[in-house]
Amino acid sequence: VPIYLDHAATSPLRPEVLAAYTEALQLVGNPSSIHSAGQSARAVLEDARERLAAAVGCDRNEVIFTSGGTEANNLAIKGLYAHRGRKLIITAATEHHAVLDAVEYLETQGAEVHWLSVSSAGVIDMDDLARVLEERHEEAALIALMWVNNETGAITPIEQVTALAAKYGVPVHSDGVASFQHMPTNFGDSGLSTMAITAHKLGGPVGFGALIVSRATELTPLFHGGGQERALRAGTMDAAGAVAFAVAAETPQPDYRELAALAVELISPLGTLTRGSTPGVPNILSFTFEGCSGESMLFLLDEHDIAVSNGSACTAGVARASHVLLAMGHTQESASSALRISFGPQTSLEDIKALAEALPNVVATARKI
């Protein structure tokens, strides 16, 4: 049986999600239609919105459904930038490409970016943030910082970031895709203006996500059309997708700490945990293996029916040195030697032991390639 340790790329549909999703797919009616079929679909959509809001810790009107995390991040960053009419964006080079590429696109449109310093464990330098806010808050359009890094699992102290930003009235967006459900992420208590989340990292369907937008936050929309989703995101809404997302969000994740402890214990003799002793979520672990190509190791493990990754899967299937590890100060060689393992509800201690059993030969072979 294949061992799947790449849940941070996508996590298989959970049984309860699949059951609810297939039932909801039989709905007839556009949620924007005023006839009874349309209103039935609207009722299902709004019930799902309310349930998702409860799981996120926000008001139902703050949930803006999107096609996933990438769209949600783009809507937040481009929407805040356009609405505020200021030039400076504050972010870090360790962000997901959905954030980095959106920010770099805005640079071509006249934005200026302050790239925050990042520690060797992948945590932003709060002194650097305090300094740039003090000196340039009047120019700042937004701050964009992920809550949990999708490659290393390192946690950003978001409440500290928002407390600092609030002094200067600068909105904070967070990519919450890797944090939601894997650590306490209550939007209402976070101080965030916007947060991106997605269903398929939680055992929901691919192609469905949300941007959580606080009531006080105004955005310029990316899409124009029928004015759905508080006029922030036009397009016919997918009621069945919303139901599936709500069920995935309501279904708790297992406690992965025992799996993480075993993985660190068994893999550390061969590789180095990239986040070191920095606090991180237990379901994402990244290791570097000196003298190895991570790509070679990935293929060798695949021959053992073990699926892992080099880092983010959102680089169009192209294996390359991790931009996250490069930003953390790793050499090109070290950043190319990384493997990420990530857990889901089906992951067992036996899976971790099987990985650890296969690794010594895989590492030895990879060093010869």
Question: Language-model segments: which ranges?
Answer:
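Pyridoxal 5′-phosphate
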Residues: 1-369
